[in-house]
Regions:
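PAS-family sensory domain signal
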Residues: 1-35, 87-134, 212-264
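Non-catalytic regulatory/interaction regions at protein termini and inter-domain linkers
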Residues: 1-53, 60-63, 270-271, 333-340
């Protein structure tokens, strides 16, 4: 183990190594990762005990020459997402432990649940960020598309049980400092509050090794994205099957309460749902119209919405939405007023 902590994800059929120290690993079964380690059985037993008790553990190997330490990674609902484990000479102190942050995304409802640890790792301000009931677009980094981000967006659109994902992204924290964050997630079916099975992505994140500020690998895509930006227009990617906002490409839209999607309140005026359903069929390419979206005061605000679709991965499409305030003529055509 080279003296580093191993982060072991424990939500699959077999515990899988997802990090060595701060270095990301792609769900390597622990029996493969430690196949030549004579303490494999002892470490498996330590992981199993931490899973059973939800407690940290310190144990000595049968020959009394090594110590094994474990730290469970427990989600706020009590579910264990993984176990940090370290083994070293008896009497030795382990290295500094990168603190994993457990997190959970309800892919069916479009609601994310973070923890103080996952928010800290993501560079968020704990004094203003609520870990519960977060819209996906609030948890997903806004702005430029990152290398390999299409895979994550495609996974969010497909929401397939059993799917796993791991990656490392460069970003900035709430104070503007460059950070690097690794994460892993696994989709599964769990009972939802409505009695149906929901697709739940459970995962962990942690701060990766520092690196130089990221150089975007797809500069052409970024130039196109920036070139199409317009003042007063706010673009985002969304899941066309349920209108869940996934990622803001521009600054988040300020004139309607897009965060209300994380509650039981309607995502738009009930009378406009049929119009939206027709728009998201994408039969005629880009389509647009005025929809009444949740206002910050609890009412409704008319918003001009243009939707199209974009291929985020081969044969997987997300919706692309552009939001702006409607013109008086567009309000009149829709039979609405600014106060509707």
């Amino acid at each position: 183990m080279a003296g580093d902590w191993l982060l072991v994800e424990t939500m699959g059929r077999e515990p899988a190594v997802v990090a060595l120290g701060r270095q990301l690993k792609n769900f390597v079964p622990i029996t493969v990762f430690l196949r030549r380690n004579p303490r494999l059985a002892a470490m498996q037993s330590a992981i199993a005990e931490s899973l059973q008790t939800s407690q940290s553990l310190v144990s000595i190997t049968p020959k009394n020459d090594r110590v094994i330490r474990t730290e469970p990674v427990v989600m706020s609902d009590g579910r264990i997402h993984g176990v940090h484990i370290w083994s070293g000479p008896a009497g030795a102190e382990p290295p500094e432990r990168p603190i994993p942050g457990p997190l959970k995304w309800n892919m069916t409802l479009g609601v994310a649940t973070d923890t103080p640890e996952s928010l800290t790792n993501s560079g968020r301000n704990l004094e203003v960020e609520d870990p519960e009931g977060r819209p996906f677009a609030q948890s997903w980094p806004s702005g430029d598309l990152k290398p390999n981000e299409g895979r994550a967006l495609a996974a969010a659109v497909r929401s397939e049980p059993g799917h796993t994902l791991c990656d490392t992204w460069d970003s900035t924290d709430w104070e503007g400092n460059h950070i690097r964050v690794s994460f892993v997630a696994r989709n599964g079916l769990e009972p939802g509050p409505d009695g149906r099975d929901h697709v739940i992505a459970r995962g962990m994140n942690w701060r990766a090794e520092p690196a130089n500020p990221a150089q975007q690998t797809d500069r052409l895509a970024q130039r196109i994205l920036h070139g199409l930006a317009q003042p007063g227009v706010h673009r985002a990617l969304f899941d066309p099957s349920n209108w869940t906002l996934l990622k803001w490409l521009d600054e988040p839209c300020p004139f309607y309460d897009w965060r209300r999607v994380a509650t039981d309140a309607p995502r738009m005026h009930p009378s406009d749902e049929a119009r939206l359903a027709a728009m998201t069929e994408f039969a005629a390419g880009a389509t647009g119209g005025v929809l009444r979206m949740p206002g910050h005061d609890g009412g409704w605000v008319p918003v001009h919405v243009t939707v199209s679709r974009v291929e985020v991965e081969q044969d997987t499409f997300a919706g692309l939405v552009a939001l702006r305030l409607p013109t008086p003529a567009e309000l009149t055509e829709a039979g609405l007023s600014e106060s509707d």
